[in-house]
Amino acid sequence: MKINNLLLIGTFFFILCCFPFIELQANELKPTDTIEYFDDGSYYEITLQEDLNIFRSSTKNGSKTVTYKSANGTTLWSVTVHGSFYFNGTSAKCTNSTVSTTCPASTWKITSASSSKSGASASATATAKQYISGKLSQTKTKTVTLQCSSSGKLS
């Protein structure tokens, strides 16, 4: 009986001690979107996604995606920068930057994609080309940048 009570008390104190380190913020799971329109009605949809971090820490991971869509909302292609950051309240630093792309539209092709990091920023650049009847119709190059503040806020 005493061992069970000690185990119960020990478990209670363990949970009590660890609870302040748990950081469950539902708003971190919701992406934030902005839109940039072109004259022909097509647009870039820009989405910021912050990865959930259940323990308070000085690291932050997230991604920023630019999706190019037609005037009717069809996704043509996208480029995403994935960034990892370290922050300490006075400064921030990007520790890793990677790029990923998608191209579901048959008339578009991603011809190049690269990523880089500098200071507290992670960047990715992609070039997409549209071919109609085998001929180049248009080219779009887009750079997306993910930044981290000294307090760990991604933008």
Question: Could you say what each language-model-derived stretch is?
Answer:
Residues 1-73:
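N-terminal prepro-regions of secreted/extracellular proteins
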Residues 53-155:
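Mature secreted bioactive peptide module from preproproteins
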